Amino acid sequence: MAPNIRKSHPLLKMVNNSLIDLPTPSNISAWWNFGSLLAVCLVTQILTGLLLAMHYTADTTLAFSSVAHTCRNVQYGWLIRNLHANGASFFFICIFLHIGRGLYYGSYLYKETWNTGVILLLTLMATAFVGYVLPWGQMSFWGATVITNLFSAIPYIGQTLVEWAWGGFSVDNPTLTRFFALHFLLPFVIAGITIIHLTFLHESGSNNPLGISSNSDKIPFHPYYSIKDILGLTLMFIPFLTLALFSPNFLGDPENFTPANPLVTPPHIKPEWYFLFAYAILRSIPNKLGGVLALAASVLILLLIPFLHKSKQRTMTFRPLSQTLFWLLVANLLILTWIGSQPVEHPFIIIGQMASLSYFSILLILFPMIGTLENKILNY
C-alpha cells in the first residue's frame, strides 16, 4: 500500500496528529468548542490588525486622525476597524467561557496546560490594554495614565519603573510608539504560546464532562469535531457580525471620540468591559499598593486552583454543592463587572468590597471546603 503523505510528510504529519487523526473523547460537549474559537479569534485579530497597521500612524499628533482616516477613506476601513474592536470583545468572551469550562470540569488538573493558559490570558490582557491606547482618544490616554501609574505603588523602584515605561515624565509620544510596537508584537507571542499550550494538551489528551479516563473510547478529531467546531464558529460569527455591523460602538466608551487632552480629565475613567471585574477589585481597596496586589491576585489566583482541588471527583458534573458555588462565583464576577463601570460612591463602594471579598473567599476557602465536605458525604 502506498504511504499516505498526510502521515509521512514531516510537516503534514504534525497537522495530522493535531487536527485530523487526533484521538478525542467521544463525549466532549459544546463547552470544548472554545479552544478552536479562540484560535479563530486570534487569526481574525492578527489579519484585521495587520490591515489597520498599514494605515495607522503611531504619533500623538496623527494617531487619532489616522484612525478617523481609516474609517472614512480606506476601502472597508470602517469594517476592518469594527471587526478588530469587537473581535477583542469576542476574544475575551471566548476566553472567559473557556476558563469557566476548565474550572467546572477540573481541566486545571493538567497543570502545564492550565499554567500556559494563564500565561496566555495575561498576555492577551496586556495586548488588549496597549491596543486600547492606540486610537489616542480621551479614554485611551487617561486609561494608559491611570493603569501605568499603578506601577509607581511598587516600593523603592516604582517611580523609576513608571517613567521608564512612559519614556518620559508623562504618557506622551514615546509611550504611544512603544505601545504600538508591543501591540504589534504580542499577538505573535500569543500564537507561539498557544502552540506550547496545545503541545501540553496533546501530551495528556482532552478531559471530558465525566472527568474519567476516555482511553477506551476515542474517536478521530476529523470529521467529528472538525464539523462540530465549524458549527460553533458559525454560531459565534452570527452575534459577532451582528454587533460589528449594527452597533459597532455599543461596547466602546463615548469619551474615546474626543481626541486625547492631558488638561481635561474625563468624569469617569474606566477600562473596556472585559477588565471591569479586575478594576472593581483594584478600587475596592483604599490603598494604592494593596489595590495593585489585589488586582494582580485576581488573575494570578488561577495558578493556585490546581492545588486547591480537594474533591475525589475531577469534574463538578456529580457535585451539586460545588456547582452551586461555581454559579455563585459567576454571578459574583458579573456584579464586579457592573461595579467596575459605576462611579466611586455609596452604595457602589461597599458592594464592590463585598463582591471582592466573596471572589477571593469562594476560590481560596469555600471551594476546598465544599470539596472536602462532598468527599465526607460520599462516605455515608
UniProtKB/Swiss-Prot annotation:
Subcellular location: Mitochondrion inner membrane
Residue numbers binding a ubiquinone: H202
Keyword terms: Electron transport, Heme, Iron, Membrane, Metal-binding, Mitochondrion, Mitochondrion inner membrane, Respiratory chain, Transmembrane, Transmembrane helix, Transport, Ubiquinone
Annotated binding of heme b b566, by residue: H98, H197
Mode of membrane association: Multi-pass membrane protein
Cofactor mode of binding and number, as noted: Binds 2 heme b groups non-covalently.
One term of GO molecular function: metal ion binding
Organism: Alectoris chukar
Any one of the GO BP annotations: mitochondrial electron transport, ubiquinol to cytochrome c
Name of the protein this chain belongs to: Cytochrome b
Transmembrane segments: 34-54, 78-99, 114-134, 179-199, 227-247, 289-309, 321-341, 348-368
